[in-house]
């Protein structure tokens, strides 16, 4: 086949294929153009998720007839010149997006320059038939895209259902809206308003907070830590959720570089590392994080759609983001999710009925078979009258008891005022500690709470010094289910030795343990080794030391902690609560589950209609 030049329309269609994948891609390019045009209001109208019609209207600076004619040509832009190539502050090349979109659709652009007398219009079908005419329009630009991909039917076949395509477009608009809280946005689909976001004109932090509430929700802000971190070349701000407020996917993670939404692996890994002590591997935090970086230190042109970026010093950026998130979480370390208490109160209002074990009968306190009956006056009158001395002793003892009770009540009142988690009042099902504060009831999971305390304590030991080893009087032989698990533990024996565990191979499937960390006390060695083997066998020999330490610390903490089912005295319960108040990140266990929930008195009173 003879080599030949491609036609201009074919070149444009190929270029469009790199950038324009679906209606959401068109909306992204055109809305970013509107942002770059200094717009304060951007309206988006869609029909059939954008397959039939996309209209983007803005009140930006607009274009003259000459600019309009040039804007739809390839390799033209109003956004920068050659000297700015390493210092890009805009979101795209107006002269790149428009011809690419025009090549695969029927496009109509109407625009009026600010303070101009006339508006102009240009119409293109498949990128051809370019003709500028005089029109009527307000200041700004309106772009209509009809019959997207009509010129590339193969691409049209691969579009998803309207619902899926619409969700992608809504996601794009939300991301851009988060980055520009001063701009008003509206999104209408098939005549139905889906988004209406009012532009904010207060200080930057207030603007961002309100836009996040409008886009992500008020619950997120209530359960999020504010990030404010600065260096000479970087600044990081935004909100990231408390570990107990998490999701099953990373869909609600909004990351921005110089106000540009990105889905960058480096940033996602940094986010995962920052939360690795607080969340299970299958749970994800929610965040809206904005990194402002010297444009010369980041390349945004790595990907045609600019979804990925390249940093001059990626490790430095990664470490800064981890530090910024951890600092923010530390400041919110004792707080558990506010929605957990709300969910608990909803369960009180609408209790779940267990159909497997229905209540067999209702006990009537007046029936003969009742287990409890109120004491009658006749019973009280049966006290013998001839024990005068005993009565005197009882009275004196009673006075002493009353004084002790009063002292204890006064002490508890001080605790309720002074401490966030209040004074322990009871232990429920030998698993949950019930405590009282000035205006709430706190329910604490004793195992989850103590596990968190143990995790932080062991982690501190591992950072500052080697764990003190405790030699077993009689070495423990642990038989594992298979040779693979035994080999895995043995392969890591040198690393485990530094973590306080001394072991040797004993036969094909067994391990002999001679020393354990002193901090674990009287631990079940069999269970400890089996749990460690389960954790590590999935990773084999190639597990990194940091990851190994994470797994070992988690296993140690689990065996160190108070188990559910253990009865605690009032002093032990209060001691646990005080330790929680003095330990960072005690509001959740290291899987992101809450260690306590707080039920406000006003909410409890509402349950009773008070």
Curated annotation (Swiss-Prot):
Swiss-Prot/TrEMBL keywords: DNA damage, DNA repair
Which PROSITE patterns does this entry report, sorted A to Z?
DNA_MISMATCH_REPAIR_1 (PS00058)
Instruction: Output the superkingdom of the source species.
Output: Bacteria
For this UniProt entry, what's an example GO CC term? mismatch repair complex
What does the record list as GO biological process? mismatch repair
Q: Which InterPro entries match?
A: DNA_mismatch_repair_CS, DNA_mismatch_repair_MutL, DNA_mismatch_S5_2-like, HATPase_C_sf, MutL/Mlh/PMS, MutL/Mlh/Pms-like, MutL_C, MutL_C_dimsub
Q: Mind telling me which SUPFAM superfamilies this protein's record contains? A: ATPase domain of HSP90 chaperone/DNA topoisomerase II/histidine kinase, DNA mismatch repair protein MutL, Ribosomal protein S5 domain 2-like
One GO term in the molecular function aspect is: ATP-dependent DNA damage sensor activity
**Family annotation (HAMAP family):** DNA_mis_repair
Family recorded in the similarity comment = Belongs to the DNA mismatch repair MutL/HexB family.
The record describes the protein's role as:
This protein is involved in the repair of mismatches in DNA. It is required for dam-dependent methyl-directed DNA mismatch repair. May act as a 'molecular matchmaker', a protein that promotes the formation of a stable complex between two or more DNA-binding proteins in an ATP-dependent manner without itself being part of a final effector complex.
Protein name as annotated:
DNA mismatch repair protein MutL
- Name the gene: mutL
